[in-house]
Amino acid sequence: MKLIKLTENYKNEWESLINEFEINQEKLIPFGVKGNCESFLEFLIESENNSKGLDLARGIVPSDIYFLVSNDSDYLIGAIDIRHYLNEGLLKSGGNIGYGIRPSERNKGYATQMLALALEKCKEMQISKILITCSKDNIASANVIIKNGGILENEIIENGIVKQRYWISRDMFNINKG
């Protein structure tokens, strides 16, 4: 498995991933998979700008969106968004990382592998402490975070939803090498 940034030849796979979330009437997670883009070309430009910190909306921090693929396929299994640093809002509930696996590929261990690969990217970016949050009722996501060294700091209530805040420090990055 590997994380990639999309190029022009991934248009159909990108559309397929988005379509699967829509068919299942699910919120597209992470938001950066599509953002506010109407087209794939617009997505590619926005992703590049986000990575460089260009033309960001107020309150948005630079981020990199990666997609999980197997080593021998272009099929997009999931996506993970790495935010370069935390602002006040992200420190409270958004965290450094947001991720999602397409509905048909869940419960196969992909999220755990994807997060482990993303933590390696964080290491390359010299992000030494990672905050990841999830809803308390999202037990699968909590397990993914814990398997990758996440330590629960606390729980907060946001818009009536209990969110758990986990920290992973650089010395914990190599916990899961799945």
Which sequence ranges carry the predicted segments?
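Glycine-/small-residue-rich active-site loops that bind phosphorylated ligands and cofactors
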Residues: 74, 89, 106-107, 137
